[in-house]
């Protein structure tokens, strides 16, 4: 469990009135603010702080989700034949809009190579 503290008495004067996060599960303390002796965000073992008294501070912790990697999905509700016909007859599809990398784009504004790439990526045999 993590709790916030302000040190009110300590043998080490540089700890006085400093603010810390104590992680009782890891036995660590993270310095939030100190006048001297400790850097902001410095992590030390609680035992390194020596004897001290403190007052507990209320914490408002917002859980954060850390996502690394992942997938991206663009949904285009079309038939393959529609896109292939739009390549051959762009004049028949002036308003055909698709999603590419999160952006809406007119299919006819893409280069022929990009159009083929969209068709290939959109219509696959399997995932």
From Swiss-Prot:
Record Pfam families: Gly_radical (PF01228)
GO cellular component: cytosol
GO molecular function: formate C-acetyltransferase activity
UniProt keyword Chaperone, yes or no: no
Annotated SUPFAM superfamilies: PFL-like glycyl radical enzymes (SSF51998)
Keywords from the UniProt entry: Organic radical
Superkingdom, natural source: Bacteria
Domain Glycine radical residue range list: 5-127
Modified residues (Glycine radical): 102
Signal peptide: none
HAMAP family to which the protein is assigned, alphabetical: GrcA (MF_00806)
Protein's recorded name: Autonomous glycyl radical cofactor
Recorded name of the encoding gene: grcA
